């Protein structure tokens, strides 16, 4: 069950089994964290590997700087993207699907429903990124396909299943950096098409979502050609 609490000016979401990660958040707010490695550090996004009393964790801080008005209106109409991702992750893992990395804590600093800053504590998976593997054999391709199919069956999508978003640990496939968007038929079809593009895993499901996606791409390319731009 998801628990919601307030720490200073932050609204905090945790799973009832992961309330210990509130201690990690408090350490971060007190500037008392041990940073092992910085993965990303740009104006609006900081992603780092930290060492804690509960092992290594991923800490992500995101403060959106662009399209603020657009994000505000989207949050009013559709709700919050990361809250939805947190809820989906808890639901799917509670249903027994553990291929996706766990999302332990989400903290938000917001006005009304618009979030100015997100703080996320996420499971660190100590394995080999798929992008560091020169060869992907058929057995591994099958595991990748099965992991995405299982994700779809539980109502989630990857959104971007490239090699950097899969980690192999003890011979098993783990998925990271998932999408919090609704698992529509078109988004599932995009995942399958991307698997074929990245890994040569043939898409054998040509449902309505697939044909709508193909049609939209053809229309976008048609409009680009009318404007004198190359097709994508």
UniProtKB/Swiss-Prot annotation:
Disruption outcome: Inactivation of the gene leads to decreased susceptibility to human cathelicidin LL-37, an antimicrobial peptide that acts by damaging bacterial membranes. The decreased susceptibility to LL-37 derives from an altered capacity of the peptide to bind to the bacterial surface and a diminished capacity to lyse membranes. The susceptibility of the mutant to other cationic helical cathelicidins is unaffected.
GO terms for MF: ATP binding; kinase activity
Keywords recorded for this protein, A-Z: ATP-binding, Kinase, Lipopolysaccharide biosynthesis, Nucleotide-binding, Transferase
This enzyme's EC code(s): 2.7.1.-
Physiological role: Kinase involved in the biosynthesis of the core oligosaccharide region of lipopolysaccharide (LPS). Catalyzes the phosphorylation of the second heptose unit (HepII) of the inner core.
Listed pathway(s): Bacterial outer membrane biogenesis; LPS core biosynthesis
Organism: Escherichia coli (strain K12)
Protein name: Lipopolysaccharide core heptose(II) kinase WaaY
The organism's place on the tree of life at top rank: Bacteria
GO process terms (BP): carbohydrate phosphorylation; lipopolysaccharide core region biosynthetic process
GO cellular component, one term: plasma membrane
Catalytic activity: alpha-D-Glc-(1->3)-[L-alpha-D-Hep-(1->7)]-L-alpha-D-Hep-(1->3)-4-O-PO3(2-)-L-alpha-D-Hep-(1->5)-[alpha-Kdo-(2->4)]-alpha-Kdo-(2->6)-lipid A + ATP = alpha-D-Glc-(1->3)-[L-alpha-D-Hep-(1->7)]-4-O-PO3(2-)-L-alpha-D-Hep-(1->3)-4-O-PO3(2-)-L-alpha-D-Hep-(1->5)-[alpha-Kdo-(2->4)]-alpha-Kdo-(2->6)-lipid A + ADP + H(+)
InterPro entries (UniProt xref): Kinase-like_dom_sf, LipoPS_heptP_kinase
Record gene name: waaY
The keyword Protein transport belongs to this UniProt entry's keyword annotation: no
Thylakoid as UniProt keyword: no
Enzymatic class: transferase
Family (UniProt): Belongs to the protein kinase superfamily. RfaY/WaaY family.
